[in-house]
Each structure stands twice: as structure tokens, then as C-alpha cells.
Amino acid sequence: MFINRWLFSTNHKDIGTLYMIFGAWAGMVGTGLSILIRAELGQPGSLLGDDQIYNVVVTAHAFVMIFFMVMPIMIGGFGNWLVPLMIGAPDMAFPRMNNMSFWLLPPSFLLLLSSSMVEAGAGTGWTVYPPLAGNLAHAGASVDLTIFSLHLAGVSSILGAINFITTIINMKPPAITQYQTPLFVWSVMITAILLLLSLPVLAAGITMLLTDRNLNTTFFDPAGGGDPILYQHLFWFFGHPEVYILILPGFGMISHIVTYYSGKKEPFGYMGMVWAMMSIGFLGFIVWAHHMFTVGMDVDTRAYFTSATMIIAIPTGVKVFSWLATLHGGNIKWSPAMLWALGFIFLFTIGGLTGIVLSNSSLDIVLHDTYYVVAHFHYVLSMGAVFAIMGGFVHWFPLFTGYTLNDTWAKIHFTIMFVGVNMTFFPQHFLGLAGMPRRYSDYPDAYTTWNTISSMGSFISLTAVILMVFIIWEALASKRVVKSIPLTSTNLEWMHGCPPPFHTFEEPAFIKSSNK
């Protein structure tokens, strides 16, 4: 029965599919919002006519892409589908809680969308800083609805994190240690730990903001002995681990894709990859104030946060060079998934380099809140996280559906997307260096050229998104059934065929220990 299967599901594959579909739909909404932003900035003068509505669109774009596209697809979609299969578990540890984690997201999304329908909407930026997010600058229910939306999304992620940690630690076959699990499983576990430790801090911060707005507390109001900078510390203590939460599962997927299409049976430097992810996870918690170099911190504090931020480049570099070493000497298959992975490595590295530039507190004081920052994090998100999602999707699509994509269309899609995102975000480095500030709906004529090129690029990306919908339709309509998958001995998730049966590993898997 349809309702029993899809509403009350306790099956990790079905819930993973729900996450995928929800994330894809939210991704369309987020893309639409980004097109509105680039349409407004395509030429000087005003299109939407109102700075408040522009900022509402920018804020919604960020929230939708982060909480309803990247996280549901990477952690909820790929995580649910692949983690139990990769460790030989029959399902997740808490299957009903898994269902609840998913069904908290649509109401959360509804609250976010409704926040833009009441009063003037929440035009605060995704950081929701007071006093702009206070009840004076944002009277009405908009920001409150946004806060409740974040609460629900946060509870969803925390429950999911508990579920993944328990599953990965507890549900492996007795014979295998944690250091024999695939890198994607490691990446999801580390991501889950980051979620578990960082989200409660965000919840605390936005709950205090909620009481400041509605119950006359003064946590962030100097008039009552509060401090708006406290909010920034609480937010970024969550916000920085969050950006690693968005990219770590991508690291795991890229490791699998690069290994597979290089014809290797294991990635280069497995232990180094694991330790690099653990280091990134740990360091992600002790660098948060690099988002706050302009609030007037002591020089020694700035020196610490600059150095600590630069240290993160080391484990990240370990990962990049290990991917390149995995490619080395391989029998490389230029499949669409491999193209996405290679694009990821190249563009993520560029994003990482601009991150090193921004980690210098003195430089950041000039570049903070300019388009240089926008360019930086879109290189690691729009070309890091999204490329990893696309690579993972085209790689595992036969596993999820049992059908094959059209290779030629998939490669064309990659090419259009690659051109589009680079044309959109590369010029923004120049805008930032020339001093164009973020979160403004208009700009002096001097910035016209690069903005126009950037907006053209965004429409090319939109074309790629629409083409992707066609490619998925084409695959599901043509029904080219998967015949056989090579290398299943080192890729456990493919062992049960494509697609795998509804229940897998109902009896505990017997793992023969090969290294003894």
C-alpha cells in the first residue's frame, strides 16, 4: 500500500529515496531563488524594487540550499542508502526515528517559506544577526518562523546524527574493525559527530534570540547588559562546523568515485584519509572566530584564529594529494561520475586557496563582506558539495534505480554545468577585490561588466539543472536495465544487484578477514 510504504516507512532505502526527492525539489527552489538574485544583479538599477525583498531572497536561498538541499541529499539520501549496505547492516539502528528525521523536514521547509509570506519576510541573511534580527528592525513573525524552521531542521539532523553514529559503531559485522569500513562510512560518522556537537549551540543561540524578540530578555541587547557579539560566537561555533558537515560526506563520495573509475581496489593512503577527516572535524570546532575578524578582537586572538585556520589546509591537502595519488597509474575510465570527481578536485582546491587568502586576519578585514567571500564559499559549495552530489548521483544511480543514465547526455550536462558555475563565480573574485560589498541589490556602474558576466553564467547553470531533469526522465523512461557491475568485491554496496532487494543482509554478513 502506497501510504504504508512511503509515509510510515522504516526502510533505509525508501527513506533515502524520500530524502533524495525532497532534496532535489528543494534544490529547484534554491536554484530559482539564486536566479532571482542574479537577475537583480545582472545590470545596475533595480529589478525587484525593494532591498528588503532582495535580502529575503538571499536569506531563503542560503537556508534552502544548506538545510533542505545539500544536507538532506548527502547525509539523508546517500547516507541512508549507502551506509547500511557498505557495512553489511540490515537497516539503520533506529528505523522509525529515521522516518521521523525525514518527516520533520517538510514542516520545517513550510515554516521557512511561510516566514517570507508574513510581514516583510526575514531579510536578515542566513546568519540572523541581532539587532537586525531583533523585534525592532524585524517586527512581526517572519524571523520567529525562520527560527522555528531552524529548530525543526536541527532536531531532524540531531536525530539523524544519533542514528548514524549508533549504526556505524554498533551494526558492523563482528569481524571488521572501524578501520576496515569504507571512507564514505567514515565521512558520514565524522559528519554526524560534528552535527551532534554543533547544532545544540545553534539551538541555544536562536532560542535566546527568540526570547529576546518575544519575552523581553536581553541576551543580545546592550541596554540590558547583553552583547550582540555573543550571538555571533554562538552562531559561528555552529556555522563553521556546518560548512565541514556540508563537504565531508562529499569527500567520502569523491574517494569512492576516484578509486572506482581509476580501476583501483582501494584509495591511496586509507589511514591518512581517515585521520585527515578526523583532523578536519576536530579543527573545524576551534576556528569559528575567523568569521568575526572585523568585530574588533585582540591582535593575539586574531593571530590564533589565523594560524588555526591555516592548519586546516594541511589535512585538506592530504586528501587532495591522496586523490591524485589514487588516480596515478590507474586505468582511468572517463565516465560522467569521474568527470564530476575531477572537476570537484580542481574547483574545490581553488576554493581552498581563496580560503587561505581569507584566513589572514589583516587581508580579511579588507575582504570581509565583499564578493570575494561569496566567490570563496561558492567554489567550495556550488562546485565542491554540488559536484560531489552530482558525481555520487550519476555513479550510484544504477544502484538506486536499476537503470543506466545516457552517458553522452550526462557528459554534456557536466560540461554545461562546469562552464556555468565557473562563469558565475570566477568574476566575483574580481568584484570582491575591487570592493563590491555583499547583500546589496544594486551597485555603482564600475562593477557592471563582471556582474553581467556572472549573471549570464548563472543562466547557463540553470540550463544544466533543467537538462538534468530531462536526463533523469530519459533514464527512467528508457529503462535500460543494468547488466553487471565490475569490482563488487571491494564495493560491498553493489553486491546484491541493481537495485538491491527491499531487505538486504537479513542474516549477519560473514566477512572473511583477508589481512591475517
From Swiss-Prot:
Residues 1-11, 87-94, 171-182, 262-269, 328-335, 401-406, 479-516 are mitochondrial matrix. Gene3D superfamilies: Cytochrome c oxidase-like, subunit I domain. The chain crosses the membrane at residues 12-40, 51-86, 95-117, 141-170, 183-212, 228-261, 270-286, 299-327, 336-357, 371-400, 407-433, 447-478. Residues 41-50, 118-140, 213-227, 287-298, 358-370, 434-446 are mitochondrial intermembrane. GO terms for molecular function: cytochrome-c oxidase activity; heme binding; metal ion binding. It is found in: Mitochondrion inner membrane. It is a multi-pass membrane protein. Cu cation binds at residues 240, 290-291. This is Cytochrome c oxidase subunit 1. It comes from Cratogeomys neglectus.
